[in-house]
Amino acid sequence: MNKMILCAAITAAFGANAATYTRAGDVEQTIEITKQVQLQAMPSYKVTDNKASGGALVKTTDGSTANLYIGVAPASKGVNSLRIVDTTGALTLIGSLGCGKGVVGNIDSSATLAGNNSIAATCENAPTIATLVTSMDPVSPAPGRYTFKQEYGTYVN
């Protein structure tokens, strides 16, 4: 068989079913893939001479902003009246919420976090979130060791 005839037969057989494309336009979208946010927590609560002070600071390790949260007690009445309860429920630290970059924080009472500090204090699009303690209840707690456990992380609206 002639090679030319064979090529023509193959082209005719496969080319006959080729689709006709009519361009209507283009669709274009740019997506951004960001690196995972790394957080660092630094608790520094203390009681000296029956005066509570210190706080807990959570920050992004690279200074980037994120939606940050930290657990506080359900008895928290607002960002200027936070409650942080120890694991036994015997001591409550009282303070306020601070957010980096001048962000105004919020309380999400619908959050269901683990432990005694089960609602979320939040800072949207901030590099840091902190609880700042100024007092405690009871004012003169019994001598002993008190452990404060607060969940922290990022959230999506």
Residue ranges and their predicted role:
Residues A12, T92-L93, N116-N117:
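Processing junctions and N-termini across compartments
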Residues A13-N17:
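N-terminal signal peptide c-region/cleavage motif recognized by signal peptidases
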Residues T112-A114, T122:
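Solvent-exposed, low-complexity segments and loops of surface/extracellular structural proteins
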Residues M4-A12:
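Sec-dependent N-terminal signal peptides
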Residues S96-V103, T122-E124:
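Sequence contexts marking disulfide-bonded cysteines in secreted/extracellular proteins
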Residues A19-A90, I119-T147, E151-N157:
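N-terminal small/polar-rich segments of proteins
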Residues V103-I107, T128-A130:
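Secreted/processed peptides and extracellular or luminal domains of membrane proteins
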